[in-house]
Amino acid sequence: MANSSEVTARAPRPRRGIARFRPWAQTAFLAVWLAPLGKALQLHRIPSCVFHCYGCPLSSLACPIGVAAGFGDLPYFALPLLVIGVLVLVGGLVGSLVCGWACPFGFLQDLAAKIPTPKFRIPGWMGYGRYVVLIGLVILVPYLWGKTHPLYICNVCPAGALEAGVYNMAKQAVLGGPVEWMRARKFVILGVLLVAMLFTYRPWCKVLCPLGGLLALFNRFSIFHLRFKAEECRECNLCRSRCSMGVKVEKRVNTADCIRCLECTTCGAISPAAGRRTNQSSPKRKSPPARARST
């Protein structure tokens, strides 16, 4: 049976790593995405790399998902090359780091998670829902049926309801116009999602976000990545307890389920890295040296 000193040695105190700066980075990026100068400088047509609605009056850049889906409604076949270029560039550089550090809708979910309510974990297999939304609502629906289809991504987008729907409905109310059911439907979806945010961490990011799912595919080969150092692992499970996405970091480092919030780096065995990767798979932990037999 291990004595108290051995238990203490295996459970080090969390380090104050780079993750403590994440709320400040999210706030700074929020100011960038909602900068009024964006429209004045004609930046509104340039796609960003985060999930938000370009219909918001304060939006500075375009939503990459909305732009990509909009190409499907054209009378001729076309590829959103600028969107593809931006996402491949960002994904190849940092992967889903933008989800954890720059996305305004992710920031909203982080703030909601701070409310002290009972929390439950979403099963990992539900993460494939992101690719159902990406292939179905972003690609197939607009190409086959156009923007008028009820399941067109912009017609059910919760970010659109929050960032643009509030303004548009208020404007219609002031002008005396009717509230369209298409916009009201988005508010129902947003309401369900807001309630879910109180009881589980980042439900949109885990289950439905098409952009997060796409960027997560780059995690295994992006220049920025996480490195697991087996020789420094004390099997304290600190990295697991710090991961709100439910990733077994020491076994599945750089998985597509990771938003790279870097909370797991408070454990000394995991650290951010850039450039060449020494080992894509998580190496086996070193077993402690056997005690010498007393004679």
Task: List the predicted regions and their residue ranges.
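Non-ligating segments of multi-cofactor redox enzymes
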Residues: 1-250, 256-295
